[in-house]
Amino acid sequence: AAMPLFIGYFQMKKQGQAIREEGPKWHNSKAGTPTMGGLVFLIGSILTGIWVGAWQKQLTPTLFILLFVLALYGVIGFLDDFIKIFKKRNMGLNSKQKLIGQILGGIIFYLVYRSEGYPGVLNFFGLDLPLGIIYGIFALFWLVGFSNAVNLTDGIDGLVAGLGSISFAAYGLIAWHQHQYDVLIICLSVLGGLLGFFVYNRKPAKIFMGDVGSLALGGLLAAISIMLNQEWTLLLIGLIYVMETASVMLQVTSFKLT
């Protein structure tokens, strides 16, 4: 219900997505399309998660850890989008500023994760590897890596909203199978938000999710895979994100070498 109002506000203010000159020609038609739609479904997902968690008596540390990751990475994306749109700086936050925010978020996540008694054991295709402090480095890499991977994938109408819906549905099933109902609540809350957003984001998109949505979704997926001790599954569930990131890295490397 809030999305049409959000779209209308951006159209009224004539604030929308800026398109880089070096981008594909077909991106030019998207110039001026409202963005930051991720803000709407993030707020909705957080409020729904808390409400359902309270209703089902599942306001656990795990639930709040996941909501923290969703909110913090969303704030980083929000600042990036805000600078792009309202400060008229097409690059938003620079890569160093974004990385510092993502790393700080990952460190806080890991410290809270360990303080709640989680063992720091990596599940590698069914084999449990007790990594100790090294697991902290892995967790940091996982959150930062996948938040950026989802962000890089967000370039085609409806793509991340559709892939995200599939990803959170998959982790919802895993959480249900493991009887981790607090994680299930978060998965379903975000899934509902993404399905509602997809109606407006499918081709031709009336609004984009922006970095506020994509960075938050990627960070949350990584955190969920860790909380479920199913880290390796993200390589399958998030295969498109991994492939897109690898493609971008190859293109950048090729460009620098030529």
Name every feature range the model reports, one short phrase each.
Residues 37, 81, 211:
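Divalent metal-coordination and catalytic microenvironments
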Residues 57, 85-86, 117-128:
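Membrane-interface helix termini and inter-helical loops of multi-pass transporters
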Residues 31-42, 96-105, 161:
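Select subsegments of transmembrane alpha-helices in polytopic membrane proteins
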Residues 19-33, 57-58, 62, 182-184:
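Alpha-helical transmembrane segments and immediately membrane-proximal extracytoplasmic
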Residues 1-11, 41-75, 109, 132-150, ...:
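Alpha-helical transmembrane segments
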